[in-house]
Curated annotation (Swiss-Prot):
Its EC number is 4.1.1.48. The gene is trpC. Pathway: Amino-acid biosynthesis; L-tryptophan biosynthesis; L-tryptophan from chorismate: step 4/5. It holds the Pfam family IGPS. Belongs to the TrpC family. GO terms for molecular function: indole-3-glycerol-phosphate synthase activity; phosphoribosylanthranilate isomerase activity. This is Indole-3-glycerol phosphate synthase. Transmembrane segments: none annotated. It catalyses: 1-(2-carboxyphenylamino)-1-deoxy-D-ribulose 5-phosphate + H(+) = (1S,2R)-1-C-(indol-3-yl)glycerol 3-phosphate + CO2 + H2O. SUPFAM superfamilies: Ribulose-phoshate binding barrel. The keyword Metal-binding does not apply. GO terms for biological process: L-tryptophan biosynthetic process.
Length: 260
């Protein structure tokens, strides 16, 4: 199986270089400083937990490398409103264009349509992208342990926190724990999809739970309905990042509602 992650990261490096040439670092920092006030991503999740509800991070995703086009009828603002009305805690918006057909415009449209906090879902490899996320209005950023070295994880987390954003740290297996040991974010995601093969197993989250005691654990990928949610909640996981299941639904709001 081709190492998909390495291919994505190589493309991302070229993309970031082009973006820096178009909008220099000083300007992107200024735009980040002028952005709308941050909405607390982690507080929104904890608010659902206090009500004994699953906290759903609902994803706005048009396509993926493994599945191709997922939702042809793709209207980010409309999708965001459906998610908010159905009880989602937060939004996740893909901004990667080459592999996920995402766009910063989708993030902006979604955030303007609702009051929910929004995560920039992308492959962050440079501090420029952290400033960029805030400039676009993101309230949180994803840091993928498999894509970054320890020093990068620590620098990017510190910068995100300095800008007021929540960090969702994404792990896949126990080999990534050591380089994350100094991170302070309370929000630790486990991607049930192996980013090197794109195969999915909920066992990934379960296998890491003992090492993540005291963290707010987010299970990502492979959650297909209420049975999966109840299965994970019975094992102490109450936060769910879900995209494809919702994106394939004719009635997105109704699909989200089935989880509660």
């Amino acid at each position: 199986m081709t190492d998909i992650l390495n291919k994505i990261l190589a493309t991302k490096a070229q993309e970031v270089a082009a973006q820096k040439a178009a909008v220099n670092a000083e300007h992107i920092r200024a735009l980040a400083a002028e952005a709308a006030p941050v909405r607390s991503f982690i507080d929104s999740i904890r608010g659902k937990h206090r009500l004994n509800l699953p906290a759903v991070i609902a994803e706005i995703k048009k396509a993926s490398p493994s599945k191709g086009l997922i939702r042809p009828d793709f209207r980010p603002a409309e999708i965001a409103r459906a998610y908010e009305n159905a009880g989602a805690a937060c939004l996740s918006v893909l901004t990667d264009e080459p592999y996920f057909q995402g766009s910063p415009e989708y993030l902006k449209q979604a955030r303007e349509a609702v009051l929910l906090p929004v995560l920039r879902k992308d492959f962050i490899i440079d501090e420029y992208q952290v400033y960029q996320a805030r400039a676009w209005g993101a309230d949180a950023v994803l840091l993928i342990a498999a894509a970054l070295e320890q020093g990068q994880l620590e620098r990017f987390e510190a910068l995100a926190h300095e800008l007021g954003m929540t960090v969702l740290l994404e792990l896949h297996d126990e080999t990534e724990l050591e380089k994350c040991r100094n991170l302070t974010t309370p929000l630790w995601g486990v991607n049930n999809r192996n980013l090197r093969t794109f195969e999915v197993s909920l066992d990934q989250t379960l296998s890491l739970l003992p090492a993540l005691e005291g963290k707010t654990v987010v299970t990502e990928s492979g959650i297909t309905g209420k049975a999966d949610v109840e299965f994970m909640r019975a094992r102490g996981v109450h936060t769910f990042l879900i995209g494809e299941t919702f994106m394939r639904a004719d009635d997105i709001g109704a699909e989200v509602g089935k989880l509660f």
